[in-house]
């Protein structure tokens, strides 16, 4: 499981039932509230709100992502974040401080720039 060391920060078992034929988990990372899974076909995560009981599964094929932005850890913000831009919405995801965002950037570039 996982080509990148960022995958060691979370367990991907909860994503395995969601995979389609031929899909493989590349990396699973901890988000501030939940987890995110990068596969060879798409990104899967749960769009949770901190004080909401609603949990929405988001399946985002790489081909629907128009761009992304990464904010690294800084003195005033201990968490890194990733913004995924689609034609209809921007998904802002907050990662825990131990996530290697350079590896996330490399993974996204691999599928978005191919």
Q: How should these model regions be labeled?
A:
Residues 1-36, 98:
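Anionic N-terminal interaction surfaces
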Residues 7, 62-65, 71, 94, ...:
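Generic signature of intrinsically disordered, low-complexity segments enriched in small/polar residues
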Residues 19-35, 39-90, 110:
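Phosphoinositide-binding peripheral membrane targeting modules
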Residues 86-103:
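Canonical phosphoinositide-binding patch of PH/PH-like domains
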Residues 98-114:
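Terminal and domain-flanking low-complexity segments
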